[in-house]
Amino acid sequence: MCDLIEPQPAEKIGKMKKLRRTLSESFSRIALKKDDTTFDEICVTKMSTRNCQGMDSVIKPLDTIPEDKKVRVQRTQSTFDPFEKPANQVKRVHSENNACINFKTSSTGKESPKVRRHSSPSSPTSPKFGKADSYEKLEKLGEGSYATVYKGKSKVNGKLVALKVIRLQEEEGTPFTAIREASLLKGLKHANIVLLHDIIHTKETLTLVFEYVHTDLCQYMDKHPGGLHPDNVKLFLFQLLRGLSYIHQRYILHRDLKPQNLLISDTGELKLADFGLARAKSVPSHTYSNEVVTLWYRPPDVLLGSTEYSTCLDMWGVGCIFVEMIQGVAAFPGMKDIQDQLERIFLVLGTPNEDTWPGVHSLPHFKPERFTLYSSKNLRQAWNKLSYVNHAEDLASKLLQCSPKNRLSAQAALSHEYFSDLPPRLWELTDMSSIFTVPNVRLQPEAGESMRAFGKNNSYGKSLSNSKH
């Protein structure tokens, strides 16, 4: 079933600002330990139902996907260009931000944010959780419009952590997106979702303390250009779908899937990150060089102005990332704007109409006269390496559907034949169990690194430990 959520009316903005200030003050009394799972979700609103293929939920959010301005990482441009002319290279950006929403319905049907407050017990003679002096900053990892990420070390247990320091605005208080990220992540316990250890609130900042993960999928692909080892692609994709299935069953969307938001540990574990930190913005009518990359993984329904978001939104991003891992280039690397992005999609999948995508003509930005009329192609014509891997093209084709209702759900994708050669025990793991606890499940050396990573009897992930990110 699909749950539709109506947006809040504009006249509530004033009340929302007052609520932000109240919640900001409440954060000074919140200090959560690693094992505290009682921090509740915030936003509450009405739900109705809708259908989507597999097991999906449609959500119409309070806001839309954010644009990020982060640390740059250079990526390769696809050679499959519908305009058949050279274009300037686009640089991908690393993001600390994105929005993700979980909504519940109150017994009265009215919208009323709720926060349950907890403080963490601590010894007066030892470093405390929830205190800024409990962590040592080691180096800056990235900086966004209102948040900075540092590599840090816990003085409590000596473990490495990632510190997201969010600068607070006096008038607005704690940003709802930061509250949302904290509330969601404290309730999500899964091996393939980044773990939130602690929350620190001061007058000027709100700091979210995460487990430290060595690199992300974007950097990993930059380090291994030309496409990843097929076995590693399968393990990364399996973990991505595992994490998404977990949050989708809880009516949570990630809404900003891209390689920069998928962390890779030194043992090869993939973890979903960046839940709700960014400020929300409208889908832009134009973009700038450091924003254009965020369009690469955005589905055509959103590009065309749809605001009825479902778990199918995330599944489009999965398809794009799957193709990129195999082919070694982004699936749809638009170079200019939304129009260009849609042209690249339609060149491969065909220009939609009411027969292939019922309801497309009602989308705000769909103007048939603006688009070249393309016929759909086999995906291997665009990305030839899909044909080298059993069942890869079929799975990609079921994820990269223009009509959101036709996209495979995360749970259904896990049962696809593409994964049929993996050990059955992978489907029996508990949520917090890593896939690498199953015998014989391990990453393979990427091209050219066998001697470097395995010749000295080292674990695979040690080659990543010196990555700067």
UniProtKB/Swiss-Prot annotation:
Serine/threonine-protein kinase activity is promoted by associated cyclins CCDN3 and CCNY and repressed by CDKN1A. ATP binds at residues 141-149, 164. It is found in: Cell membrane; Cytoplasm; Nucleus. It is a peripheral membrane protein. Its EC number is 2.7.11.22. GO terms for cellular component: cyclin-dependent protein kinase holoenzyme complex; cytoplasm; cytoplasmic cyclin-dependent protein kinase holoenzyme complex; cytosol; nucleoplasm; nucleus; plasma membrane. The modification Phosphoserine is found at residues 24, 78, 95, 134. GO terms for biological process: cell division; G2/M transition of mitotic cell cycle; regulation of canonical Wnt signaling pathway; regulation of cell cycle phase transition; Wnt signaling pathway. It catalyses: L-seryl-[protein] + ATP = O-phospho-L-seryl-[protein] + ADP + H(+); L-threonyl-[protein] + ATP = O-phospho-L-threonyl-[protein] + ADP + H(+). Residues 135-419 form the Protein kinase domain. Residues 456-469 have a biased composition (Polar residues). InterPro entries: CDK, Kinase-like_dom_sf, Prot_kinase_dom, Protein_kinase_ATP_BS, Ser/Thr_kinase_AS. Keywords: ATP-binding, Cell cycle, Cell division, Cell membrane, Cytoplasm, Kinase, Membrane, Nucleotide-binding, Nucleus, Phosphoprotein, Serine/threonine-protein kinase, Transferase, Wnt signaling pathway. It is an enzyme of class 2 (transferase). One of its GO terms (molecular function) is protein serine kinase activity. PROSITE patterns: PROTEIN_KINASE_ATP (PS00107), PROTEIN_KINASE_DOM (PS50011), PROTEIN_KINASE_ST (PS00108). The active site is at 256 (proton acceptor). Changing residue 164 to R: Abolishes protein kinase activity. SMART domains: S_TKc. Highly expressed in brain, pancreas, kidney, heart, testis and ovary. Also detected at lower levels in other tissues except in spleen and thymus where expression is barely detected. Coiled coil: none annotated. PANTHER family: CELL DIVISION PROTEIN KINASE, CYCLIN-DEPENDENT KINASE 14. Belongs to the protein kinase superfamily. CMGC Ser/Thr protein kinase family. CDC2/CDKX subfamily. Found in a complex with LRP6, CCNY and CAPRIN2 during G2/M stage; CAPRIN2 functions as a scaffold for the complex by binding to CCNY via its N terminus and to CDK14 via its C terminus. Interacts with CCNY; CCNY mediates its recruitment to the plasma membrane and promotes phosphorylation of LRP6. Interacts with CCDN3 and CDKN1A. Interacts with SEPT8. Interacts with 14-3-3 proteina YWHAB, YWHAE, YWHAH and YWHAQ. Serine/threonine-protein kinase involved in the control of the eukaryotic cell cycle, whose activity is controlled by an associated cyclin. Acts as a cell-cycle regulator of Wnt signaling pathway during G2/M phase by mediating the phosphorylation of LRP6 at 'Ser-1490', leading to the activation of the Wnt signaling pathway. Acts as a regulator of cell cycle progression and cell proliferation via its interaction with CCDN3. Phosphorylates RB1 in vitro, however the relevance of such result remains to be confirmed in vivo. This is Cyclin-dependent kinase 14. It comes from Homo sapiens (Human).
